[in-house]
A protein has these predicted regions:
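N-terminal secretory signal peptides and thylakoid transit peptides that target proteins
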Residues: 1-14
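C-terminal segment of N-terminal export signals and the immediately downstream linker at the start
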Residues: 17-46, 52
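N-terminal edge beta-strand
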Residues: 48-66, 189-201, 334-354
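Hydrophobic or amphipathic alpha-helical targeting/insertion segments
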Residues: 117-153
C-alpha cells in the first residue's frame, strides 16, 4: 500500500455512498441509531460542588456512541434550549452538510426543534462529538459547556487485543478571564467528576486495559500519568501509529485523543491524573482500583519526559507533495489571531484539487502552542519542530511556540472544509481558514 493510499483510506473511497446517505432521509418511521437531546443540567462534580451547564442526554460526558465503519448511521439531535446549536462529528470524513460547522454549510438545530443526520462513519477509531460555534465572552457556550462525548467507530476488521476499555474524558469548569485576558478555570474533572468524587475504575491484576483518552477542554493541554504504570500508545486521534511506544506521560492538547494500553501489574489504588499538582488538587484525576485493594489513592510523580509525535512514526521519507500551503501564525492587536496576516473571515482560502497531495506548513510566530484541527480529513505529520516523521496520521496537531510543523494531506473529500485552532478563545478571535476544492 502506498503512502497516498494510507492517507486516502478509511472513508475517501466510500465518499459517494457517504454523500448519498447524508442527503437521503431514512425510511419513514425508522428509529435513529442514536438520539442526542441538548438541555440545561445541574452537574454534581463532587459533593457540594454542583454547576450549571448544557449537556447531551442529561449527562457529562454525553453517551458513548458506537457505529460500524462503513455502515450508515442516523442521529437525531433534539435542541431543548433557547439557542441554536450545532453538533460536530470530530474526526469523521463526511460531507460538509452534516459535518457540524456553520462555515461549511451545516444547518443549525433551531431552538426547541430537532434534526436528523445520516452519514457513513469513516475512518474507524476513537472519534468524538461536540458543540461547534463561537462563544466570545460567554464562557458557558460552545466547548466551555458540557456538550461533548466519545464516538467509537468500530472497524470492519479486528480491533486488537485488550481485556477492558475505559474512556478518560478531560474537561474544566467555572471558566473566567484572568488579568491577562486569558481563560482560567477553578474546577477540573475526568468523566464529569472531580478526583475522589466519582466511582474508581475497577481493574484486576494481569488485565490489559485500553484507555481512550479525550481532551475535551476548550483551551488547555493536559499531561497525564498513572502512578506506577506506563502507557503503551497504539493510536493518536483514533489512527493506529506505525511505532507503538511505552511512555510514562500522555500529553493531550484540546481535541486530541490518545489510545493507550496499560498492563495492570502493580496492585493497589492509584491516581490517574494531571502531573501538575494544582490541577489534580482542583479535580483533574480519577482513582484506579485493583480488585481486593483498599485505601486512599496514591500519587507517584512520573520521571521527566518530553512528548514527541515523531517517536511514534516510521522511517520512510515523505514523498514530494503536489502543492504546498504555508500558514504563518501571528497575534495582532486587539487579541486577534492571524494566518498570513489576515484574520477570519478575511483569511485567504487554501485552494486544493481533488486527489492531490498537499503539504501544510504551520509557522508559529508566537510563544503559545496551537492545536490545529482540519475538518473532514486527516493528515500525516512529515516534520515536527525540525524532526522528520512519517506514518503518524492525525486530525489535530499541536504546533509548539516559535516552531514549524509540516503535515501532508490527500484532498479526497470535496466540499468546503474548515481548519482552525481548537483553542476556543483563539477560534473566536479569527484563528480559522477555509480549504476549498478548485
Amino acid at each position: 500500500m502506498t503512502r497516498r493510499q494510507v492517507l486516502s483510506l478509511a472513508g475517501y473511497g466510500a465518499l459517494g455512498s457517504a454523500r448519498a446517505a447524508a442527503q437521503s432521509a431514512p425510511p419513514a418511521g425508522a428509529e435513529p441509531d442514536a438520539t442526542l437531546r441538548i438541555g440545561e443540567i445541574t452537574l454534581e462534580l463532587a459533593p457540594r460542588r454542583a454547576i450549571k451547564t448544557v449537556a447531551y442526554n442529561g449527562q457529562v460526558p454525553g453517551p458513548m456512541l458506537r457505529a460500524k465503519e462503513g455502515r450508515p448511521f442516523t442521529v437525531e439531535v433534539v435542541n431543548d434550549t433557547a439557542e441554536p446549536e450545532m453538533v460536530h462529528w470530530h474526526g469523521l470524513h463526511i460531507p460538509p452538510e452534516v459535518d457540524g460547522a456553520h462555515e461549511e454549510g451545516t444547518p443549525h438545530v433551531a431552538p426547541h426543534d430537532r434534526r436528523r443526520y445520516t452519514f457513513t462513519p469513516n475512518p474507524s477509531g476513537t472519534r468524538w462529538y461536540h458543540s461547534h460555534g463561537h462563544a466570545g465572552r460567554n464562557l458557558r457556550k460552545a466547548t466551555y459547556s458540557g456538550q461533548f462525548g466519545v464516538l467509537i467507530v468500530e472497524p470492519s476488521q479486528d480491533a486488537g487485543r485488550y481485556d477492558a476499555e475505559v474512556p478518560i474524558v478531560l474537561h474544566e469548569w467555572e471558566p473566567y478571564f484572568n488579568d491577562e485576558m486569558d481563560v482560567a478555570y477553578r474546577l477540573f474533572s475526568i468523566n464529569g467528576k472531580m478526583l475522589g468524587a466519582g466511582e474508581p475504575v475497577a481493574v484486576r491484576r494481569g488485565q490489559r486495559v485500553l484507555f481512550r483518552v479525550l481532551n475535551a477542554s476548550a483551551t488547555l493541554t493536559h499531561r497525564l500519568a498513572l502512578s506506577g504504570h506506563v502507557f503503551r500508545v497504539i493510536a493518536l486521534d483514533g489512527n493506529r501509529v506505525p511505532n507503538p511506544q511505552a511512555v510514562p506521560v500522555l500529553e493531550v492538547a484540546p481535541a486530541e485523543r490518545v489510545d493507550a494500553i496499560v498492563e495492570m501489574d502493580r496492585p493497589g489504588v492509584w491516581i490517574l491524573g494531571e502531573t501538575r499538582s494544582d490541577q489534580r488538587a482542583a479535580g483533574m484525576g480519577i482513582a484506579i482500583e485493583y480488585a481486593g485493594a483498599q485505601g486512599a489513592p496514591e500519587w507517584a510523580a512520573p520521571p521527566p519526559f518530553t512528548w514527541d509525535y515523531t517517536a511514534f512514526g516510521g522511517g520512510e521519507t515523505a514523498p514530494e507533495p503536489d502543492g504546498r500551503h504555508k500558514l504563518v501564525i501571528r497575534e495582532a492587536s486587539g487579541h486577534r489571531w492571524t494566518l498570513n496576516g489576515k484574520s477570519f473571515p478575511k483569511t485567504d482560502p487554501l485552494v486544493v484539487r481533488a486527489n492531490r497531495r498537499y503539504r501544510l506548513i504551520f509557522d508559529n510566530q508566537t510563544a503559545q502552542a496551537h492545536p490545529m484541527h482540519l475538518h473532514r480529513h486527516r493528515f500525516e505529520i512529515t516534520r515536527c519542530a525540525g524532526k522528520p516523521s512519517s506514518g503518524v496520521l492525525k486530525d489535530t496537531v499541536i504546533v509548539p511556540g516559535w516552531k514549524e510543523v509540516e503535515v501532508d494531506l490527500v484532498a479526497a473529500n470535496p466540499g468546503l472544509t474548515l481548519m482552525h485552532c481548537h483553542q476556543q478563545l483563539h477560534m473566536d478571535t479569527g484563528f480559522m481558514v477555509m480549504m476549498q476544492y478548485g
